Amino acid sequence: MSKTATLADTVCHTSTENLDLIRGGSLLAPALATMQEMPFGRDTTLRRLLPQIPDTYDFVFFDCSPSLESLFNINVLVAVQYVLIPIKVDKNSIEGYNVMLETIQSVREIANPDIRALGIFMTAVETGASLDREMIANFPQMLPELAFHSYIRKNIDVKKAP
């Protein structure tokens, strides 16, 4: 995104009806580099830019890496109302959701009083694995107020994709 381009200029229309994307990588890299150089206000950049996106969207989703140290991820947390938390069926992800909930609480207290955890869902689930089947059965009872009953299966074809 150049200094003259707006966030709306980066919206890519897809062949799927009612689905547009803002691609990361090369399009967002210059904006992220610019944010890194800002002396102040860099954690609120996205919140200031979001009004540039047309009101034609009911939802705007940001797909973030698991790192809570990323400037982009911090910007997202400061800008959004709701957070969907994906977890894999592994020790790090299961322990990490508590850290994420604590982070959301901190962001709510300091920078974004509107942020809430909307829910937690399992991803990369291998339904043939006994641990994954056990998690599918017990997950809703573990987090009754946040757990989604649906999950995303692990798909090897996604890993093979270019």
Question: Where are the regions a protein language model picked out?
Answer:
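P-loop NTP-binding core
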Residues: M1-P162
